[in-house]
Amino acid sequence: MPFTLGQRWISDTESELGLGTVVAVDARTVTLLFPSTGENRLYARSDSPVTRVMFNPGDTITSHDGWQMQVEEVKEENGLLTYIGTRLDTEESGVALREVFLDSKLVFSKPQDRLFAGQIDRMDRFALRYRARKYSSEQFRMPYSGLRGQRTSLIPHQLNIAHDVGRRHAPRVLLADEVGLGKTIEAGMILHQQLLSGAAERVLIIVPETLQHQWLVEMLRRFNLRFALFDDERYAEAQHDAYNPFDTEQLVICSLDFARRSKQRLEHLCEAEWDLLVVDEAHHLVWSEDAPSREYQAIEQLAEHMPGVLLLTATPEQLGMESHFARLRLLDPNRFHDFAQFVEEQKNYRPVADAVAMLLAGNKLSNDELNMLGEMIGEQDIEPLLQAANSDSEDAQSARQELVSMLMDRHGTSRVLFRNTRNGVKGFPKRELHTIKLPLPTQYQTAIKVSGIMGARKSAEDRARDMLYPERIYQEFEGDNATWWNFDPRVEWLMGYLTSHRSQKVLVICAKAATALQLEQVLREREGIRAAVFHEGMSIIERDRAAAWFAEEDTGAQVLLCSEIGSEGRNFQFASHMVMFDLPFNPDLLEQRIGRLDRIGQAHDIQIHVPYLEKTAQSVLVRWYHEGLDAFEHTCPTGRTIYDSVYNDLINYLASPDQTEGFDDLIKNCREQHEALKAQLEQGRDRLLEIHSNGGEKAQALAESIEEQDDDTNLIAFAMNLLDIIGINQDDRGDNMIVLTPSDHMLVPDFPGLSEDGITITFDREVALAREDAQFITWEHPLIRNGLDLILSGDTGSSTISLLKNKALPVGTLLVELIYVVEAQAPKQLQLNRFLPPTPVRMLLDKNGNNLAAQVEFETFNRQLNAVNRHTGSKLVNAVQQDVHAILQLGEAQIEKSARALIDAARNEADEKLSAELSRLEALRAVNPNIRDDELTAIESNRQQVMESLDQAGWRLDALRLIVVTHQ
């Protein structure tokens, strides 16, 4: 290898050193200085891992002074090169630049530059890069992007709402599904879609204080969204880092109380430029025209500053018309400004609901009914659709569905309000109550008497809370070492029940973490019962492990002991037996407890066991819940209303359980009130709204389509290949689970989403739902998205050389495989990837420019090739550099036609879809005032920007592979 002082070379093994200069040569060695790092390297002359850097006419080079030049001619004299060309800054022509004055920080980013500089990748990395481009492009084009990656069951009504709302510009909607139907999941799906598509980047979630951790856990476990929890302490800390503390995080959860307590804090929240606000339990925001509550005003102020708002609330009729109007007013104050007008409007929806019911019934329609439908929809060209709907043809059903869809678009609050009820959604289990009355131990009787004397000044509410948990009263007097479990009959009963039902998974819930911990110890020590514990003092990872142990069928825990707060946000559908060791203070908490098992998808009827002590607040409460509200065996939408109305009386009975006079009358009154309210709710159901929210057959088809995509085996093969190349260890644990751990030779030292201890993953949705410690891997999971980003944002796999053993071709025949990418640059929120994601175009050219890609499929061809080591590859490249340049020019001439076809198709699709959406909403605007002006303006602006961006779309060479034919 001829070396001359002043020549520029690059290291094949340490390309990060930049451009080296030959500074010393003797008979056996050569020394290179790398000025950008100041390091020297000594190599053997005969076989050194370095490549000569030589540029060609057409290349752009940079001098060590920073100016750039377009090369027009290359001269060689005594082994040194001089480049002649035109300076780009001054446009001076005929400028000469000797190679010794080239910029030493030279980075080869173009695939051809890397190839000619000897920066040759392994063959498997080239294949991975092409697959990453191909799959990435396909995923952007897939329908339902953003709906496939969450760890949830594929429940049609949830998918329907999320699909509708998640694609809107700055959605402002009210989610009012009945309890147990998954409002939190619907909100999470909408957020996931908006964040994934770039429609939103900053999200604020405001919830009651008791639900903060539930939301934090749900967003992380189900959607891989890492929210930051802001409380007083976190807010104070963040003030050191930014003028506005909320600018330090993109995704934030805080409590309503935290938001409204300080005027400055509320101002900071309003100024933080969020894209989306989510408010849970919005029915607690009290409003009247004369006196809106402080909480309501705080949310109103925030909603004015934010483009998108999701309000989650109990069913509207449960709360009265005024309360319902107040919620809608937060979403669109211009549309919902007059309560009296709103009440009048609601009455007018009855004929529309009747018309929908008539269409869905499938009976023949009279002329009067057809005329009425025509008037309601108000379209000129609807006659053929009406005739089809009334015919016996195969199209009748789809025509009726289309008419229903048109009616719902044009009437009611269906664009701003979604509400599903249990009556309209199938798949819920029955609930059966088993009460076990137990004697009150003398130890507790004594403790309660003493407590009554000493706590005479306590309020009735405090006494009532004490009386619910007699073991805590006993411990107050006997100290922490008091062994209440030795005489409490509930413990005896629990042990007996568990030992006689060893094969059943049982969820035991108690109010306090200390009780759960003490029960675990007793069950383990006395009966050897395997029990996992779950309480608020544990980290999310510890809770995941406990839940996973409980979920294991054969070797797992038989029992999961949960505290009230610890179990928030967790569901255990695989269990159907629940023991309430004590009772919660209000009906909402009771429903929350039962809701751990009573979910859609629960395969068995739920058995609720309540062991209670007679003559205690527990005996009062169990009767009131069951006989007064029927709250154990059915969901109780009336519970909170009745609880509030009888609160004082109920508290007095709980505080003094021995005073039973009048209690039967209270229960009777509550039951009557419950039945009346329930009938009122049923009568007030908005069938039109339920049909729209449920989604019907369309929602079912959506769920089935996503289920089909779940079976995509390409993902598993690609993910394993990707993890291999990144350098992540994989250990197959069986049961469709794999443990990933970092290795010492990763492409990056710290891979996002992979902790030091490693993670467990699964590609199976059912396994992910049963095993909380296993992450559900889809194309939308951060692990895959970060991996794709790592490969595609750098130059991994962008240049390689392979040998093709094929005796049908002459030795030394050259082929060049080119991977071009056609793409358009635009802000993420334009969601340009719907129409033109970065799309790979593969070409396989011979030296005459014949493109063989259509005849030679990538994977088949890839299997026929053999790798070349880097050093041999560099020599091969140097030998055929001129030929490769010529083939590259032929490729540049051919790519334009393919790229233009892709860009034109994307323009046509974008224009058609966005114009159709705009026309539809403009037509509806005439009959449905729930379509906001800003939504129409945004769609038109979005359309213009998308078309402009597509006009400027281009293409570039992303990767190339040089193939040399050999016979050996």
UniProtKB/Swiss-Prot annotation:
Spell out the Pfam families in the cross-references. Answer: Helicase_C, RapA_C, SNF2-rel_dom, Tudor_1_RapA, Tudor_RapA
What's the EC number here?
A: 3.6.4.-
Q: Which UniProt keywords apply?
A: Activator, ATP-binding, DNA-binding, Helicase, Hydrolase, Nucleotide-binding, Transcription, Transcription regulation
* CDD domains linked to this entry: DEXDc_RapA, SF2_C_SNF
- Give every Helicase C-terminal domain span: 490-662
Asked if ATP-binding is a keyword of the record, the answer is: yes
Gene Ontology molecular function: ATP binding; DNA binding; helicase activity; hydrolase activity, acting on acid anhydrides
The UniProt annotation places ATP binding at 177-184
Tell me which Gene Ontology terms the entry assigns under biological process.
Answer: regulation of DNA-templated transcription
| Similarity comment text for this entry | Belongs to the SNF2/RAD54 helicase family. RapA subfamily.
Chain's role: Transcription regulator that activates transcription by stimulating RNA polymerase (RNAP) recycling in case of stress conditions such as supercoiled DNA or high salt concentrations. Probably acts by releasing the RNAP, when it is trapped or immobilized on tightly supercoiled DNA. Does not activate transcription on linear DNA. Probably not involved in DNA repair.
The molecule here is called RNA polymerase-associated protein RapA
> Source species, please?
Shigella boydii serotype 4 (strain Sb227)
